[in-house]
Amino acid sequence: VPEDVTVIVSRLMSIFTNAPYDEIYNDACEFYSELAQGGFISYSDEYVEWSRDSYFSYANNALVELPKVETDDFAYDDVFGEIQQLTRVQVDVSGYCNEKCVHCYIPQSCKHGLMSIDLFTRILEQCRDNNVLNITISGGEPMINPDLTEFLNLCGKNNFSVNLLSNLTLLSDEILRVLVANPLISVQTSLYSMNEDIHDSITGLQGSFKKTIQAIRLLHRHNIPIQINCPIMKQNKDDYSDVITWAQSMNIEADSDYMLFGCYDCSKKNLKCRLSLSEVEAVVTSQCESGAYVDKLFTEASNK
């Protein structure tokens, strides 16, 4: 929701009581201009009636050219001093999951329990006291928790940006309304293949492909920022790139990775699907032969 900078400055005046108004105002304008240049906020000299379409739109979405920073020009201690700033906290609000992904690092015996509103509220209070900026809500599957919409609303009331990690198979109209109403919420999901049988064989849930695809299209229609992850494993190594191509056709951010890790009970039972060294070599070789992949690497390198 848009807010006039003078209103923000008035609140800052009650904190920085010894600083003159003009100094705080100029510093605030400079700070918000830098955030706007980085794509973190929308900032204008004129009042604009907010709508999600004007804040973020897949039709108008384009890569933001961030200013190049040389390593020698930036040192963490020079900027933040000796105080180590915590900026992001991940909160797993559900131990349960309706999928049984073959590569999941959470042992099946550990998939239980739901977080209460009281505990979530106390976590947010501590995050606010420590100037945390982003809350990542995950699980298990967070949409199994019946209090998810309340969690999201609490994050909104406390001005946290939110990254919601979900398989999206349980997306409801109630949850969708909350996502649409808050421009600070983005969604991250996994799509393993454009082949329904392959995707469902990985998730262990029949019909999960159709539900996830349908939910992605619905979020896309409402201009809710989505990121698609596509882990590469034995089951999808020959067609994972179709997921990336499909996502790019809709201007959705997507990425793939062949790194899989064992369960956190130190077992390796989920690693049967991990690529062998020769399969990793084949995947990397194929990617390097792709002009689009090489262009992406050059772009990422130039922005570092």
Task: For the regions a language model picked out, list residue spans one by one.
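Radical SAM enzyme [4Fe-4S]-AdoMet core and its adjacent flexible, acidic
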Residues: 190-192, 197-304
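Flexible, glycine- and charge-enriched loops at secondary-structure boundaries
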Residues: 21, 110-117, 205-209
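Hydrophobic positions in alpha-helices of CheY-like receiver
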Residues: 12, 127, 151, 155, ...
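Alpha-helix N-cap/loop-to-helix initiation residues
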Residues: 17, 144-145, 172, 208, ...
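Long, charge-rich, low-complexity alpha-helical segments
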Residues: 1-87
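Conserved alpha-helical substructure of the radical SAM core
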Residues: 34, 40, 59-186
